[in-house]
Design a protein with these regions (language model features):
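Individual alpha-helical transmembrane segments in multi-pass integral membrane proteins
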Residues: 4-17, 42, 58-88, 104-108, ...
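Short juxtamembrane and helix-loop transition motifs at transmembrane-helix boundaries
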Residues: 1-4, 29-34, 60-68, 92-99, ...
Length: 231
């Protein structure tokens, strides 16, 4: 990264992420959507840690290389649990929260096993390859589950505007990253996937922050609009 990308990556994005937490606290939604806010807090802390690691050891150092991929894998896991939090809110009237939590743990365990199986032959930097593969697979699964959740919202005629906005924003984020990972495999020298990562890193905190700030907890969509969307 250089120039304006440095400014975006080290200053703008962490500021937006902390802005989400502030907006959630102001809207009294911090605890209700704690996994979402926890992700933003951890993302901000990891960005600061990456910056200090880069300053201390250099952007091409092995220390920065390892920390970047390990922290990215942990962030993706946090984001996956944020998605499961949204699942819990959508299905809360069915009393399915405990099953969703168990399912989330099982899915992460399965994805971890698959990711390990895909990289276990790599003798060089196997752990780093595993972290990168785990992140990539979680993004693909997250994109699919976001679509499943959106279908459930339409079928159940969910009307909570705030919840719907949070789901849509995260669905766009997961889908864009999954597409960018696929594109990077086909065209490894292309800069498109890097631009997408910056755009989505700005998009998600902006969308969530706007939702907490501008959409009240009790806001509802009209039943007619939800019914029309489910057809």
């Amino acid at each position: 990264m250089s120039g304006s990308f440095d400014y975006i990556g080290w200053i703008v994005i962490p500021s937006l992420q902390m802005g989400v937490v502030v907006c959630a606290i102001w809207a009294r939604s911090f605890l209700r959507f704690f996994p979402l806010n926890f992700y933003m807090l951890v993302a901000t802390l990891f960005t600061a840690a990456r910056f200090f690691t880069m300053v201390q050891y250099g952007v091409r150092s092995s220390q920065y290389y390892y920390f970047y991929f390990y922290s990215d894998a942990l962030l993706t896991i946090c984001l996956f649990f944020a998605l499961m939090c949204l699942f819990s809110h959508v299905f809360q009237e069915m009393g399915a929260r405990i099953y969703i939590r168990i399912g989330a743990i099982l899915v992460i365990g399965l994805i971890s096993a698959v990711s390990y199986g895909m990289v276990r032959q790599a003798q060089d930097k196997m752990v780093t390859h595993f972290a990168a593969e785990l992140s990539q697979n979680l993004y693909f699964v997250g994109a699919v589950l976001s679509y499943v959740l959106w279908v459930a919202i339409r079928k159940l005629r969910e009307t909570r505007t705030q919840l719907i906005q949070l789901v849509l924003a995260l669905g766009v984020y997961f889908s864009a990253f999954a597409a960018s990972y696929a594109q990077s495999v086909l065209y490894p020298n292309s800069l498109v996937w890097r631009l997408v990562s910056y755009a989505m890193a700005i998009w998600l905190p902006l969308a969530w922050g706007y939702t907490f700030l501008r959409i009240p907890e009790g806001a509802r969509l009209t039943t007619a609009r939800v019914a029309l969307g489910s057809r």
